[in-house]
């Protein structure tokens, strides 16, 4: 049995979120929540919300026991980038790139 949760268009780069995702891949969900709680990265909060949603989906939809769940798969994909302009001195302009990502967490009990 497995349950899925997805957060699309999460504000933050996929490269930074993958640093957090690599720490919890294949880990028991209780341990994963502990790791994310004490991480000081912004991406950890985003991943933690998606993980909690996947746990709730497993418990509600599948009737799974939380103690047996582990993070089977976690994917961080690039989302669309928002391009903005920042005015600079002497009539110039710099491009600001605001990156987004898609976070997918799959939890399983086997």
Curated annotation (Swiss-Prot):
GO terms for cellular component: cytosolic large ribosomal subunit. This is Large ribosomal subunit protein uL22. PANTHER family: CHLOROPLAST 50S RIBOSOMAL PROTEIN L22-RELATED, LARGE RIBOSOMAL SUBUNIT PROTEIN UL22M. Belongs to the universal ribosomal protein uL22 family. GO terms for biological process: translation. This protein binds specifically to 23S rRNA; its binding is stimulated by other ribosomal proteins, e.g. L4, L17, and L20. It is important during the early stages of 50S assembly. It makes multiple contacts with different domains of the 23S rRNA in the assembled 50S subunit and ribosome. The keyword Ribosomal protein applies. Keywords: Ribonucleoprotein, Ribosomal protein, RNA-binding, rRNA-binding. CDD domains: Ribosomal_L22. It comes from Colwellia psychrerythraea (strain 34H / ATCC BAA-681). The gene is rplV. The keyword rRNA processing does not apply. GO terms for molecular function: rRNA binding; structural constituent of ribosome. Pfam families: Ribosomal_L22 (PF00237). InterPro entries: Ribosomal_uL22 (IPR001063), Ribosomal_uL22_bac/chlpt-type (IPR005727), Ribosomal_uL22_bac/org-type (IPR047867), Ribosomal_uL22_CS (IPR018260), Ribosomal_uL22_sf (IPR036394). Part of the 50S ribosomal subunit. SUPFAM superfamilies: Ribosomal protein L22.
